[in-house]
Regions:
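N-terminal ordered "arm"
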Residues: 9-42, 47-49
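Phox homology (PX) phosphoinositide-binding domain
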Residues: 2-6
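Long, charge-rich, low-complexity alpha-helical segments
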Residues: 32-231
């Protein structure tokens, strides 16, 4: 049975200005800044808020490069491998899709993507003023933010502390909804001498809530409500 692999981007990007006032993208991951060239940035941005297979990375890149009229002699394979080495793209593998998804997400830290609701509100108001959106249409635009119970708990925890997917699963298994801060997280999750940050990913994989939590995190991510980071 062949091993399945899934990929996604990690970090967030900001615009910087050089001495001549020209803007360029910088990816921030684990409080470090990474410079990327246009080809690398194109692959990274197309993998962001997506969970995809290897061949899909190439498909998304080819479409974006053709639309932008961009050409580079370096293959997208080489470029993608460089991003993987730098940790800006991450890969999860396993015998099943669930195993690969768990391997991909379990050690990632969850950062709420702020500003998405404000942006959605702006779009709705603008369309309504232009007469291009009815009340029903506005309601449908906001319907994507109707969270499940698990999604609400995950977002609440992610807003309180720098928390990993595995730590979220542990909190959900214990019914913990409030941790206040990083100290509260330590008290909630690492309550015995056996559980450590090195083995928690293996420890919580067998928890009853694991699959539900993993699916909720993946849904929040692809709907652009979470950003993945590393410590």
């Amino acid at each position: 049975m062949s091993e399945m692999k899934l990929y996604t981007a990690a970090g967030r990007f900001v615009h910087k200005r050089d001495s001549e006032g020209q803007t360029y993208p910088v990816i921030i991951l684990g409080n470090r800044e990474y410079l990327v060239d246009p080809q690398e940035f194109m692959i990274w941005i197309n993998s962001n808020w997506r969970i995809c297979r290897w061949e899909e990375i190439g498909k998304f890149y080819a479409a974006s490069a053709a639309e932008a009229g961009y050409h580079n002699d370096r293959s997208w394979h080489d470029c993608t491998n460089r991003l993987l080495v730098r940790g800006l793209l991450v890969c999860g593998s396993g015998e099943t899709k669930y195993d690969a998804l768990y391997d991909l997400l379990s050690s990632m830290y969850l950062i709420p993507a702020r500003g998405r609701i404000v942006l959605r509100l702006y779009v709705v108001i603008k369309l309504a003023l232009q007469g291009r959106a009815s009340l029903g249409g506005a309601k449908r635009l906001f319907s994507t933010f109707s969270h499940t119970k698990s999604e609400k708990q995950i977002l609440k925890l992610a807003k309180q502390a720098m928390i990993s997917t595995a730590e979220v699963i542990c909190c959900m298994e214990k019914g913990i909804k409030n941790i206040r801060n990083e100290y509260g997280l330590m008290d909630a999750v690492y309550t015995d001498s056996e559980t450590t940050s090195d083995n928690i990913c293996q420890t919580v994989k067998g928890y009853r809530c694991c699959q539900d939590a993993l699916e909720a995190i993946a849904n929040l991510y692809v709907s652009q409500q979470l950003i993945f980071d590393r410590a």
